[in-house]
Amino acid sequence: QARAPLPPPTPAEPPQDKQAALLAVWNEARPLSGSPAALYLQTRGIPPAAFQTALNIRHCSALPLWATDTSGKPLLIGHFPAMLAAITTPSGQLQGLHKTYLHSVSGGAWQKLAACHPQTGEPSPAKKMQARHPAALKGAAVNLFPPDRQGRLIVAEGIETALAARALFGLPAAAALSAYGMAAFEWPPETLELFICADNDTSNTGRHAADTLAKRAITAGIKAQIWQPETAGFDALDELNRRKKTGSR
């Protein structure tokens, strides 16, 4: 006896697009100038000249911080000030938000939030990313500045690292947000030369990502060069603060 044919598989639902919700959060955020987020960057050692005209970076006075409770349900830890950054495509389409939660310390300085999970006591990450859908962040970045008139652009991993590289070298910068993001970075169409700032991490992950990006750029006809701090474990921000401390250049 012939078996009845199996029913067709249920088509997978497309991932929910959260862009409208992310845009609403972004549009409620305020300019960086004079905000706790600006004071946080200064506390990290970044001069205002490196970030005061930056694009795609704002301040939110009370951003919710969510975790997952022990039963797997969303758990609100609280509302905190935050530095908010828009993760975009080269054309400016919002793909996600990068959130750095903050708290004030003595002397008017601001630092990354030190919060704990209320049930487990484990530290809660002060930095979080939220994408519009699972595949949205590939190639996207926090495009802090467009390339200059010569088409030159710095690419670094972190936001603070990219701004520090701008302070070090005087060129516009973008933050790829991770080694994976650097390797997959999509440069703006007007880019003619990439200055890739690699973290000098012990795993060499940052250098490998920089090499991958450089090879992609050169294949596409874009000039590329890689800079890396000489000190093991350093990134551009560590190098900026070292030079300020020692008075070297």
Q: Where are each of the predicted segments found?
A:
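Long, compositionally biased, charged low-complexity segments
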Residues: 2, 124, 241-243
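Phosphate-handling DNA/RNA-contact segment within nucleic-acid enzymes
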Residues: 66-189
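Residue-level preference for alpha-helix termini and adjacent loops
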Residues: 25, 56, 136, 158, ...
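TOPRIM metal-binding catalytic domain and adjacent DNA-binding surface shared by DnaG-type primases
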Residues: 1-83, 88-91, 147
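A short alpha-helix capping/helix-coil boundary motif
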Residues: 15-18, 141-142, 190-192
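Tryptophan-centered motif/residue detector
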Residues: 22-26, 101, 174, 217
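TOPRIM fold recognition
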Residues: 107, 150-154, 159-249
